[in-house]
Amino acid sequence: MNILSMTYEKFVQKIQELGLEKYRADQILDWIYKKHVFVFEQMTNLSKQHRSLLRENFCIQIPKIVSKRVSSIDKTTKYLYELSDGNTIESVLLFHEGYATACISTQIGCPVKCSFCATGQSGFVRNLDAGEIVSQILAIEKDSKQTVRNIVYMGMGEPLLNYDNVIKSIKILIDKKTKNIGIRRVTLSTVGIPEMILKLSEERLDLNLAISLHASTNEKRDQIIPINRKYSIQEIINAAKNYQERSDRRLTIEYILIKEFNDFDEDARKLAKLLNGLKVFVNLIPVNSTFSNFEKPAKWKINRFKEILINSGIEAEIRYEKGADIEAACGQLRIRNLLSKQL
């Protein structure tokens, strides 16, 4: 059993079933989550007998670093990890105002296949289990010697299509006995699966929800996000409203700006109208053209789009890519690795 896949309560139960006291579970989790010790033999406040018992019944699966790139611009660090079955995933460590943020993956590949995203181009393999999601945080902290303060579920994959494992991983990471990450420092990014957003509302987790909208009309969104043909923009907005009413959290809207596609004044006005009445913040993101045929709009046009939103009462900011020199955007490192193996 992988300890990283277990909630605190479940781990305590298993420890007690082995005849150990509850406080032993606390000691073990302290070694793992605070000291980043992943080998039972190195847990020196446990007896040899206890360490042997743990080794026979549990494992601590930490992914292997296949590749690591550090930006010379902003110290953003991109990791490519190999899992126990040989599949690879990506995680990114970012720095903002002195705080470390981990951007983590939830699936190997992605079934959504957004046309501007590198991850979808490599195909979908499988969901990550809760332990594989949690392990990314520990692997980042172990290597970087940084304490992750914020977590964004914004790496490879669509989190709401791996709902149970994602929610379980969040509950593990926010537990005071493990990472003790504040729930308001957790952000989940989704293209918008209405029924799953409604289900998330029932969790009462009050995490930050980011909707990857990227268009203000179904006609345009259908062209870049195929799943929109199943879930319309209005259905997504209605579900987001429900989430906001339950959580009282400001929503983040992610909007990729693509030259001469969704960057017109009319697009901005329609977006403002669509978001009217919601407490939202819009991240305007010039498209990354590395693995697509799309181009970034001119800076003046990006600024103009932002200005229209702000003048319409919508908070907005331009989010320029971090780690541009190391291809830190989702899926790029993995797809390069896959391509190299085919040569």
Swiss-Prot record:
<dbReference type="InterPro" id="IPR013785">
    <property type="entry name" value="Aldolase_TIM"/>
</dbReference>
<dbReference type="GO" id="GO:0070040">
    <property type="term" value="F:rRNA (adenine(2503)-C2-)-methyltransferase activity"/>
</dbReference>
<keyword id="KW-0004">4Fe-4S</keyword>
<feature type="binding site">
    <location>
        <position position="288"/>
    </location>
    <ligand>
        <name>S-adenosyl-L-methionine</name>
    </ligand>
</feature>
<dbReference type="InterPro" id="IPR007197">
    <property type="entry name" value="rSAM"/>
</dbReference>
<keyword id="KW-0819">tRNA processing</keyword>
<keyword id="KW-0808">Transferase</keyword>
<keyword id="KW-0963">Cytoplasm</keyword>
<feature type="binding site">
    <location>
        <position position="189"/>
    </location>
    <ligand>
        <name>S-adenosyl-L-methionine</name>
    </ligand>
</feature>
<dbReference type="GO" id="GO:0005737">
    <property type="term" value="C:cytoplasm"/>
</dbReference>
<keyword id="KW-0698">rRNA processing</keyword>
<feature type="binding site">
    <location>
        <position position="114"/>
    </location>
    <ligand>
        <name>[4Fe-4S] cluster</name>
    </ligand>
</feature>
<dbReference type="GO" id="GO:0002935">
    <property type="term" value="F:tRNA (adenine(37)-C2)-methyltransferase activity"/>
</dbReference>
<comment type="function">
    <text>Specifically methylates position 2 of adenine 2503 in 23S rRNA and position 2 of adenine 37 in tRNAs.</text>
</comment>
<keyword id="KW-0408">Iron</keyword>
<dbReference type="GO" id="GO:0070475">
    <property type="term" value="P:rRNA base methylation"/>
</dbReference>
<dbReference type="InterPro" id="IPR006638">
    <property type="entry name" value="Elp3/MiaA/NifB-like_rSAM"/>
</dbReference>
<feature type="binding site">
    <location>
        <position position="110"/>
    </location>
    <ligand>
        <name>[4Fe-4S] cluster</name>
    </ligand>
</feature>
<keyword id="KW-1015">Disulfide bond</keyword>
<keyword id="KW-0479">Metal-binding</keyword>
<keyword id="KW-0411">Iron-sulfur</keyword>
<feature type="binding site">
    <location>
        <begin position="157"/>
        <end position="158"/>
    </location>
    <ligand>
        <name>S-adenosyl-L-methionine</name>
    </ligand>
</feature>
<comment type="similarity">
    <text>Belongs to the radical SAM superfamily. RlmN family.</text>
</comment>
<dbReference type="GO" id="GO:0051539">
    <property type="term" value="F:4 iron, 4 sulfur cluster binding"/>
</dbReference>
<dbReference type="Pfam" id="PF04055">
    <property type="entry name" value="Radical_SAM"/>
</dbReference>
<keyword id="KW-0949">S-adenosyl-L-methionine</keyword>
<feature type="domain" description="Radical SAM core">
    <location>
        <begin position="96"/>
        <end position="325"/>
    </location>
</feature>
<feature type="disulfide bond" description="(transient)">
    <location>
        <begin position="103"/>
        <end position="330"/>
    </location>
</feature>
<feature type="binding site">
    <location>
        <begin position="212"/>
        <end position="214"/>
    </location>
    <ligand>
        <name>S-adenosyl-L-methionine</name>
    </ligand>
</feature>
<dbReference type="InterPro" id="IPR027492">
    <property type="entry name" value="RNA_MTrfase_RlmN"/>
</dbReference>
<dbReference type="InterPro" id="IPR040072">
    <property type="entry name" value="Methyltransferase_A"/>
</dbReference>
<dbReference type="InterPro" id="IPR048641">
    <property type="entry name" value="RlmN_N"/>
</dbReference>
<feature type="active site" description="S-methylcysteine intermediate">
    <location>
        <position position="330"/>
    </location>
</feature>
<dbReference type="GO" id="GO:0030488">
    <property type="term" value="P:tRNA methylation"/>
</dbReference>
<keyword id="KW-0489">Methyltransferase</keyword>
<dbReference type="InterPro" id="IPR004383">
    <property type="entry name" value="rRNA_lsu_MTrfase_RlmN/Cfr"/>
</dbReference>
<protein>
    <recommendedName>
        <fullName>Probable dual-specificity RNA methyltransferase RlmN</fullName>
        <ecNumber>2.1.1.192</ecNumber>
    </recommendedName>
</protein>
<dbReference type="GO" id="GO:0000049">
    <property type="term" value="F:tRNA binding"/>
</dbReference>
<feature type="binding site">
    <location>
        <position position="117"/>
    </location>
    <ligand>
        <name>[4Fe-4S] cluster</name>
    </ligand>
</feature>
<feature type="active site" description="Proton acceptor">
    <location>
        <position position="90"/>
    </location>
</feature>
<dbReference type="Pfam" id="PF21016">
    <property type="entry name" value="RlmN_N"/>
</dbReference>
<dbReference type="GO" id="GO:0019843">
    <property type="term" value="F:rRNA binding"/>
</dbReference>
